[in-house]
């Protein structure tokens, strides 16, 4: 699991390789990632928009941005959490993702909450140190 806290928002990411959805012989590798956003501050926060950089093993980067996540712009109360799962296909067997959420506090102040960088690796390709 990958985790980062900034501006009173803790973001945790857990990626999973989807072997059944992937077709390596066709250059299609698919991951699901589950994100939990926790409000550690004293005011409600609302997720307004997202920005992603998705980089494959060849160094090709795709920028993705849009309003909300999975069709929602959730309001997260102090101490509350919001969790969702989404997916990312790549043409290579590994890569990484990074990004941020545009958030708005209850008082109207906007800020960027950093999503921790996380790697997309097939379990069979991970290197293990002995």
Swiss-Prot record:
The name this protein goes by in its record: Protein ApaG
Domain (ApaG): residue spans on this chain: 3-127
Database matches in SUPFAM superfamilies: ApaG-like
InterPro entries: ApaG-like (IPR050718), ApaG_domain (IPR007474), ApaG_sf (IPR036767), Uncharacterised_ApaG (IPR023065)
NCBIfam families: PRK05461.1
PROSITE patterns: APAG (PS51087)
Coiled coil regions in record: none
